[in-house]
């Protein structure tokens, strides 16, 4: 990144802080992480792995948080000791440990799992037991068809929860019972299928969270999609030039990807924000958040189509 971009990112940090406040207040955070190498002269070999920890809120806002490791405390430091609500993630143990820590503090925190990660584990085991794994994938497919129907009808959270209780809960229970039976039989624990079963059962309690709360998605794919632009840059850049550059990259990613998720042109949004931010009063800064900017843009241009690069929140 250029020096000019570094300075801009520092100015934009105040907006990222406000997005974080609103996300935490919303009570639902979806998280994932991805790595990219960074350069640092004080490290043997001159480079190491850094990580973008990514957090997504209910409305499509996304925050990229740069850290130089994948250590568990980064998650706890970001969410804080007062967070209550639902944390959706894959099976990386940092997420469940944070939820357990919060519950010991007397906080109402639950974790929601990701069915897409579970499905991928079984897809890898397809060659070992084709008929059995196809049956498992068929049941998972039925769960996803229910979600597609709910999206098609734009069902509100309370309807989603009700439909899931009627249609999806019996299938979740059926799969859980089947997984426990299979693990207790002759499936080798170290086989691909055995590993898939162990992973699924380790996630199954958290998998039921989406049945109970209609705000939650069946998987964490939206958050994974948010990470993909950084993966593209990772191929282009090969590395981040310095740990501090990682922090500034995270600030820009936060605003650009959030803008995209709200259906607006990220470049047009960022250009306008950079021009207006220096003269804005602190009390008026919320108008520059991606969600507010998108709403104002739609009010001015009611017939304009959403930017094609945007994804549904």
Where are the regions a protein language model picked out?
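Catalytic center-proximal scaffold of phosphoryl-transfer enzymes
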Residues: 1-313
């Amino acid at each position: 990144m250029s020096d000019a971009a570094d300075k801009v990112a520092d100015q934009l940090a105040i907006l990222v802080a406000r997005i974080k406040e609103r996300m935490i207040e919303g009570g639902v955070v979806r998280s994932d992480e991805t790595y990219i190498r960074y350069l640092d002269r004080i490290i043997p070999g001159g480079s190491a792995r850094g990580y973008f920890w990514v957090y997504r809120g209910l409305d499509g806002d996304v925050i990229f948080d740069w850290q130089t490791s994948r250590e568990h405390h980064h998650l706890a430091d970001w969410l804080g000791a007062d967070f209550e609500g639902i944390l959706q993630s894959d099976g990386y143990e940092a997420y469940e440990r944070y939820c357990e820590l919060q519950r010991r503090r007397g906080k109402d925190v639950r974790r929601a799992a990701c069915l897409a990660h579970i499905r991928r584990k079984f897809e890898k085991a397809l060659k070992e037991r084709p008929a059995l794994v196809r049956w498992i994938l068929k049941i998972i497919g039925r769960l996803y068809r229910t979600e597609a129907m709910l999206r098609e009808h734009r069902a509100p959270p309370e309807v989603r929860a009700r439909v899931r209780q009627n249609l999806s809960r019996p299938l979740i229970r059926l799969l859980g019972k089947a997984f426990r039976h299979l693990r207790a039989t002759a499936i080798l624990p170290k086989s691909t299928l055995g590993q898939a079963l162990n992973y699924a059962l380790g996630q199954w309690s958290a998998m039921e969270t989406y049945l109970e709360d209609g705000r939650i998605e069946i998987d964490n794919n939206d958050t994974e999609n948010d990470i993909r632009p950084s993966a593209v840059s990772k191929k282009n850049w090969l590395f981040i030039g310095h740990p501090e550059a990682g922090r500034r990259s995270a600030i820009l990613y936060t605003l650009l990807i959030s803008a995209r998720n709200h259906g607006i042109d990220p470049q047009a949004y960022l250009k306008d924000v950079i021009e207006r931010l220096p003269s804005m009063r602190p009390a008026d800064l919320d108008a520059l958040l991606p969600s507010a900017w998108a709403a104002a843009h739609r009010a001015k241009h009611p017939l304009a189509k959403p930017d094609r690069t945007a994804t549904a929140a």
